[in-house]
A protein has these predicted regions:
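Hinge/lid segment of periplasmic solute-binding proteins
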Residues: 29-40, 103-159, 166, 189-192, ...
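Short, polar/charged alpha-helical segment
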Residues: 32-37, 54-73, 420, 438
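Extracytoplasmic "Venus flytrap"
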Residues: 33-34, 38-61, 215, 407-412
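Long, aromatic- and glycine/proline-rich binding clefts that accommodate carbohydrate-like moieties
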Residues: 34, 309-316, 362-422, 426, ...
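Periplasmic-binding protein-like
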Residues: 58, 166, 202-203, 348-374
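Extracytoplasmic "Venus flytrap"/periplasmic binding protein-like
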Residues: 64-135, 139-141, 145-149, 168-169, ...
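Helix-loop-helix "hinge/cap" segment bordering the ligand-binding cleft or interdomain interface
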Residues: 68, 75, 125-126, 141-217, ...
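Extracytoplasmic/periplasmic substrate-binding proteins
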Residues: 110, 219-228, 248-340, 346
Length: 454
């Protein structure tokens, strides 16, 4: 496998090493099965534009097995984080300069790519598709066309430092000051109190945090918005986030920054940055993706927090019945302009197979999108010595079944977030008032959607 991209190379992940033990699609009867290995693709080069960063890249180490058993050569022509790959794909799709066969996709981004990806329902049997989450397959089918095959799902959960929440002295001091017991926060107000308390007690550097730019910021605001009973748009795509819920969400963010409870460089942070802060032991409690679990639990990568954190359901806001739960699924698509569609599909089948998916989910904590993989990871983590290894899967099942909420599914979601997030940054920094910033955001969104023909 070769790589040419903005990165030097794909880092090898020993934990994901996959050894080719035979040419069949399964290692043994009781082993998870591979797929996409039964065709001779000798002489075929499959080019791939992929998401990278964090734990995303480890899966690609398994591609050597695919190459060995099919005879194909896989070339990763671009590797970047979610926002970099999104920009790369949009640029090349729009310019007609597609030089890849397999491309990253995501349920939150897919609406903008519908004209550029190959409908996949004709390449997968009903039995093959039945292995995947029906709700994700349904959500990924637009006008009868299956846009993608899911790789893994994710939903934001509450990560918190158990050593802080379990400290008897801190518990006593908190209850004396705030009048209620220190426990895992169930509301956004409690989360604010805890952030304030831990920083004031000099128990931690930052009380909480969130990614502070691009869709990462707009998405985090979105889950605060719906936890407070609001939404970005009504059923007719009219922007409505200058509501009571919007004021509550924006005020929560602004107050945290004004009170010094967030990192000072919040407006520059994306996913890797906030994960690094928690890994370094600098953050008490925050909303984060399941996909970082394995990284945080690794004493070599994160010695300051490994074994010292817990996970919980996201808090509620003004709407006491609605928890945070921004969610989505990473996936693979085949470019409509690909000259090797059949071979590209085989690579997608391999990368989303039971065996590859199990290794990724079990090693790094990504949420499975296949029922067979879900069963395997639950069994594999039943008796690891760390109760959280198993408890997180029970929590994930609860959140996915009750709290799973994707962003508005329209083609220009990213165009909207690009328009909105600088204004949201200004609100957080105190450069504009909450009310004025929300009014501007709604007006700008209305103008944008009008100009785009909505």
């Amino acid at each position: 496998m070769t790589t040419r991209s903005g990165r030097l190379a794909i880092p090898l992940a020993a934990a994901f090493a996959v050894t080719a033990l035979g040419a069949g699609t399964a290692l043994a009867q009781d082993e998870p099965a591979y797929a996409g290995l039964d065709k001779d693709l000798s002489g075929t080069t499959i080019k791939m534009a992929a998401i990278g960063g964090g734990s995303y890249e480890a899966m690609y180490d398994s591609i050597s097995m695919f190459e060995e058993q099919t005879g194909a050569n896989v070339e990763i022509v671009f590797l970047g984080d979610g926002f970099e790959i999104d920009r790369y794909l949009k640029t090349n799709y729009a310019a007609g300069t597609v030089d890849f066969d397999v491309a990253w996709n995501h349920t939150s981004f897919m609406s903008q790519f519908t004209n550029f990806v190959e409908p996949l329902q004709g390449y997968f049997s009903e039995e093959e598709l039945a292995a995947f989450s029906p709700s994700i397959i349904e959500a990924a089918t637009i006008d009868g066309n299956l846009q993608l095959i899911p790789r893994h799902a994710d939903i934001s959960a509450l990560y918190y430092r158990t050593d802080l929440y379990g400290d008897a002295d801190l518990q006593a001091a908190f209850e004396e000051q705030y009048g209620y017991p220190l426990a895992v926060p169930e509301t956004l107000d409690q989360m604010n109190d805890h952030a304030e308390f831990f920083v004031a007690e000099e128990a931690i550097r930052f009380g909480t945090q969130f990614a502070g730019r691009e869709e990462a910021l707009a998405g985090r605001f979105y889950e605060l918005l719906f936890a407070n009973g609001g939404d970005y748009f009504d059923a007719d795509l009219k922007p409505i986030f200058d509501s009571e819920a919007g004021v509550a969400a924006a005020t929560w963010m602004q107050d945290l920054y004004a009170n010094g409870l967030l990192p000072g460089d919040t407006p520059t942070l994306l996913w890797d940055g906030v994960a690094a802060n928690f890994c370094n032991g600098d953050v008490a409690v925050y909303l984060e993706w399941y996909g970082w679990y394995g990284y945080f639990q690794d004493p070599e990568s994160c010695p300051n927090v490994a074994g010292k954190f817990g996970m919980a359901r996201g808090p509620v806001g003004l709407d006491a019945e609605t928890h945070t739960g921004w969610a989505g699924a990473h996936a693979f698509s085949v470019a409509k302009d690909s000259q090797n569609k059949e071979a590209a599909v085989e690579l997608v089948k391999f990368l989303t197979s039971e065996a590859v998916s199990f290794e990724e989910s079990n090693t790094f904590g990504f949420l499975p999108v296949r029922a067979d993989v879900s069963e395997r990871v639950v069994a594999a983590n039943a008796d690891t010595g760390n109760p959280l290894d198993a408890e997180r899967w029970e929590l994930a099942n609860l959140q996915v079944s009750e709290d799973f909420r994707t962003p508005p599914l329209f083609a220009d979601w990213i165009s909207f977030t690009n328009e909105w997030y600088p204004t949201l940054q200004a609100i957080i920094l105190g450069d504009t008032s909450v009310e004025d910033g929300l009014a501007k955001g709604v007006a700008d969104a209305a103008d944008l959607l009008d100009s785009l023909g909505y």
